[in-house]
UniProtKB/Swiss-Prot annotation:
Domain called RRM: residue spans: 167-238
Localization in the cell: Plastid, Chloroplast
Family: Belongs to the PPR family. P subfamily.
Assigned GO CC terms: chloroplast
Protein name per the record: Pentatricopeptide repeat-containing protein At5g04810, chloroplastic
Positions with biased composition (Basic and acidic residues): 137-163, 259-280
Transit peptide: 1-60
GO biological process, one term: RNA splicing
Stated role: May play a role in the plastid ribosome biogenesis.
This protein's UniProt keywords: Chloroplast, Plastid, Repeat, RNA-binding, Transit peptide
Alphabetical list of Pfam families matching this protein: PPR, PPR_1, PPR_2, PPR_3, RRM_1
Low complexity biased stretches: 58-68
Length: 952
């Protein structure tokens, strides 16, 4: 707080709780902390080209100002606890009665026994209603027909003045700026120029329409298809330019040259008729009583004929609190243009505007100007600078200005200490934060409750539960009453460390203490359940919150949509989006991301593309993550041509691909064995200056191993070594799998030894691939030894390991060994799948006619298990098994009758066509072929391509 008593508002965007009014008795200082996120930085007003201003128009000396407004945070009071059914009410809280009371503070010296705080929070201003669109003046005069040649009378004026690639966009919000206008329409193609028509009477607003000139006519046609799209609450009119505006400008120029007429309608209306003193009082009264109404504040200021330093200072401070640094600077320069010298307080307000807008370079420029003019920097000025760097995450710069403040000012206050502590908590440097707390206490400065919250938030970020509880205990010992912010810190701590049960316990303690939840605490609870994939409790918390009368915001809706997508209920997720729109909540890109990914993951690319188009029509500009979601789905479906089309569309929209985009494309080509394309996109990734990581090399190695180019794979590993990229178990598994496909046991064994030397532990996938290599080489003794070795190391075989072993015994024509392996697998509690039954039954049927009786009984047992499991084989497998049955039971029997129950339903119609059996020379089954050729599918149990997907 400065000497004049002005209250600074500082936002802390990383706080996990919402703003709450905190009061203490007999405050010694008054500091206003705003825990809300700062409003978005408004873009600079666009400069209108010279040819867009009418020559007759005279601009007045004053124009009304507008300011972008952040979204307000509604404060709906809670009536009852919505989490009443989630915990046991009769249980006693160990958090308050046992666990918290048993912790001892070990990181700071003792605090003062009586600490006081007066905190006053101001909600952000409401969004302004969209002003009516200014209609452009239409000139009614037309060219004289007698001055035109006869051939020009039949010429179409629309074709004469129309420009290719130019579109008209109408019904724009009058407050929109050129950068936002250009950013939205940039997604349809490269833009040559953007023309945003300024308002006639308010030049800082637009007239409600503008023009986009694309480099290609195709881009303009594509943009016109989105006529009727929603853009910041307005339904846009998008159509090709008809040349009418250029024709009107030509008519205006002709009249100006020939007649010299002045359009009296363009003259600005004067607003200087009110009394100066009454206007000043009106401004002060509005700032005191209705400061959130930005329209009323600006209107009152514009009515002052000759503002003084006081009025200018009030307006700079008003814009500074809102983070509107451009209008704050404009007001500051208007003051200097009148010959008024700024004071330290006005400079501080301007610096505060830049700090809230995250433009610390301009803030430091103001500091240099202050020093050049000999204006002393107050402690409040230093506090604002330190707070600005803290919010920007620049702890070193914050330390520099904090040290300078200590050198210049002998005594510091809790405000500047709170900001420097916040800077180090956000960078997870808790040792430095603890040292600052000790330093503050040694100076005799009482820590307000906000600093306790900052420390608890810092320990939450580093997941230090013990010290977080120590701070909570110390807070209560110093006489502070825990608020919803305090309990919100604890809830956030427990949800971050995965202890949702303790978070529920904190919620119960809140109810006992009479503290009600807010949107932030509810959001933390829902996030905790979503992380644990406990969808039922997440929805229960959401429903209880709605019953309490609280209105969810966009962030909460996004969390619920993610929960619906996580449980696979995509229809309910889309329904929730529609509910958001009915409640006038504007969906964001994050709203649609989980829906697009959900449909893509399930393989429904048609619906995924529909949601992508729906997102665009809602006014959301696609990001690289949105495009990556579509590409991931297409790659999983192996639709590489469509994936490349999405990549091209992404480039056309001006969205730069990242490492994940190219890596996913490379993985797609690797899955189909197209090594050339994989290397092509690897080169493209490097040419664009993107970082090459281990995931990129894994995709390249999979492409080489899939196509059998092991020498190329070795060259890739050498390049990895040259770049100092260590090989992990996934890289080794890919290489071992590549040699296993070729049956090269020696190379695979060498890689396993190399793994052990480098300290990389072989896992189940490594051993499974090596067993596959042994099976293909016919070395089943070594495969058996590998099983014993992995069991000795505590690595248990899984179903893919046993499937590989069964295939090996089948390939070695030892069905009795395969049957023994099958029995061992069931004894370990592993449930057989379709691939196991296929491999085992094929092997047994091939030997049943000449083998012992127990093999025949084994075939019967397996057939009955398949029938009970409801497994149906494909037609190729059925034909092959039928040929084996003819050798065992030529005239049919119990085995034939049982086995035919696993055949396809249309088997009987094919069975009567005897010629069909003669034409079948090979077996084409659902699962991998027993012979295990090098060109096996990705479902091959030895392939590691599907094993890497969880890692990615």
């Amino acid at each position: 707080m400065d000497n004049g008593g002005s209250v600074l508002s500082l936002s802390a965007p990383h706080f996990p709780y919402s703003a709450t009014i905190l009061r203490r008795h007999s405050p010694v200082a008054s500091i206003s902390f705003s825990l809300k996120q700062p409003p978005p930085q408004p873009p600079e007003p666009p400069e209108s080209p010279p040819d867009l201003r009418r020559p007759e128009k005279s601009i007045g000396s004053s124009s009304s100002s507008s300011s972008p407004s952040p979204i307000p945070s509604p404060k709906t009071p809670l009536k009852i606890n919505p989490l009443k059914g989630l915990t046991n009410r009769s249980s006693v809280s160990p958090l308050v009665q046992s666990e918290v009371s048993s912790k001892v503070s070990s990181f700071g010296s003792s605090l003062a026994s009586k600490l006081r705080l007066s905190s006053k929070l101001s909600p952000p201003p409401p969004p302004p209603p969209p002003p009516p669109v200014e209609e452009t003046t239409q000139f009614r005069d037309e060219f004289r027909s007698d001055t035109k040649p006869p051939e020009e009378e039949t010429r179409n004026p629309q074709q004469e003045f129309r420009q290719e690639g130019k579109i008209f966009v109408g019904n724009l919000p009058t407050w929109i700026k050129k950068p936002e206008f250009e950013e939205f329409f940039r997604q349809f193609g490269p833009i040559e120029n953007v023309i945003l028509i300024k308002g006639h009477h308010e030049v800082e607003k637009n007239a409600g329409f503008g023009f986009i000139i694309y480099a290609a006519e195709k881009s303009a046609m594509k943009a016109v298809e989105f006529d009727g799209v929603e853009f910041h609450g307005r339904i846009l009119t998008v159509k090709l330019d008809d040349g009418k505006r250029l024709k009107t400008k030509a008519e205006q120029r002709v009249r100006w040259v020939e007649e010299g007429e002045e359009d009296t309608k363009m003259s600005n209306k004067s607003s200087w008729h009110q009394e100066r003193e009454g206007s000043r009082k009106s401004l002060q009264r509005i700032l005191d009583t209705n400061g959130d109404n930005w329209q009323a504040v600006i209107s009152a200021f514009e009515k002052i004929s000759k503002p003084s330093r006081t009025e200018f200072g009030l307006m700079v401070k008003f814009y500074g609190r809102r983070g509107d640094m451009h209008r704050a600077r404009e007001t500051f320069e208007r003051m200097r243009a009148r010959g008024i010298t700024p004071t330290s307080r006005i400079y501080t307000s301007l610096i505060h505007a830049y700090a809230v807008g995250r433009d610390m370079d301009e803030a430091l420029s103001c500091v240099r100007k202050m020093k050049e003019e000999g204006i002393e920097m107050s402690l409040v000025t230093y506090s604002v600078i330190v707070g600005g760097f803290s919010k920007a995450g620049h702890a070193e710069a914050a330390d520099y200005w904090f040290d300078e403040a200590k050198r210049i000012h002998k005594t510091l206050n809790a405000s500047i200490y709170g900001k420097i502590i916040y800077a180090h908590c956000q960078t997870c440097n808790m040792e430095r934060a603890e040292a600052l707390v000790r330093e503050m206490e040694e100076e005799g400065i009482d820590a307000p409750i906000a600093i306790y919250h900052t420390m608890m938030d810092g320990y939450t970020m580093v997941a230090d539960e013990k010290k977080g509880l120590v701070v909570f205990k110390r807070l209560k010992e110093c006489g502070f009453t825990p608020t919803v912010v305090t309990y919100g810190c604890l809830i956030n701590l427990y949800t971050k460390v995965g202890k949702i049960s303790k978070a529920l316990e904190v919620s119960r303690v809140m109810k006992e203490e009479g503290v009600k939840h807010n949107l932030k605490t509810y959001s933390m609870m829902i996030n905790g359940f979503v992380k644990l994939k406990d969808w039922a409790n997440a929805f229960a918390v959401f429903e209880d919150m709605v019953k309490e009368g609280m209105k969810p915001d966009v962030i909460l809706y996004n969390n619920i949509i993610s929960a619906f997508c996580g449980m696979g209920n995509m229809d309910r997720a889309i329904q929730t989006v529609k509910e958001m729109q009915k409640l006038r909540h504007r969906p964001t890109t994050r709203t649609f991301m989980p829906i697009i990914h959900g449909y893509a993951k399930s393989g429904d690319m048609r619906r995924s593309l529909e949601v992508f188009d729906m997102m665009r029509r809602c006014g959301c500009v696609p990001t690289v993550h949105t495009f990556n979601g579509l590409i991931n789905g297409l790659v999983e479906k192996r639709q590489m041509e469509k994936a490349v089309e999405i990549l091209d569309e992404m480039t056309l929209a001006g969205v730069s691909a990242n490492e994940h985009t190219y890596t996913k494309i490379m993985q797609g080509y690797a899955s189909v064995g197209d090594t050339g394309k994989a290397f092509e996109y690897f080169t493209r990734l490097q040419n664009e200056g993107l970082d090459v990581d281990i995931f990129t090399y894994e995709a390249l190695l999979k492409a080489c191993c899939k196509s059998g180019r092991m020498q190329s794979a070795l060259a890739v590993t050498k390049e990895m070594s040259a770049r100092n990229i260590p090989r992990n178990s996934f890289v080794y598994n890919i290489l071992i799998d590549g040699w296993a496909r070729r049956g090269d046991v020696w190379e695979a064994a060498d890689l396993i030894q190399q793994m052990k030397k480098e300290g990389v532990k072989p896992d189940i996938h490594t051993y499974t691939s090596f067993i596959s290599a042994c099976s293909k080489a016919g070395d089943m003794n070594r495969a058996t030894q590998t099983i014993e070795e992995m069991e000795a190391l505590g690595v248990k075989p899984n179903i893919k390991t046993y499937t590989t072993l069964i295939k090996g015994w089948a390939r070695a024509s030892l069905p009795e060994k395969a049957l023994s392996c099958y029995e061992e697998m069931k004894a370990m509690g592993i449930k057989p799948d379709k691939a196991v039954y296929h491999c085992l039954l094929t092997s047994l049927l091939s030997r049943a006619s000449i083998a012992e009786a127990y093999i025949y009984s084994g075939v019967m047992t397996i057939c009955k298990e398949m029938v009970e499991a409801g497994l149906i084989v494909d037609m190729g497998t059925a034909v092959h098994w039928s040929k084996c049955l003819c050798k065992i039971e030529a005239s049919g029997g119990e085995l034939t009758e049982t086995l035919q129950k696993t055949f396809p339903p249309d088997w009987s119609s094919h069975h009567h066509h005897h010629g069909f059996l003669d034409q079948v020379s090979d077996v084409d089954s659902d699962e991998d072929d027993v012979d295990g050729e090098d060109g096996e599918d990705d479902e091959d149990v030895n392939s590691v391509s599907d094993l890497l997907s969880p890692y990615k």
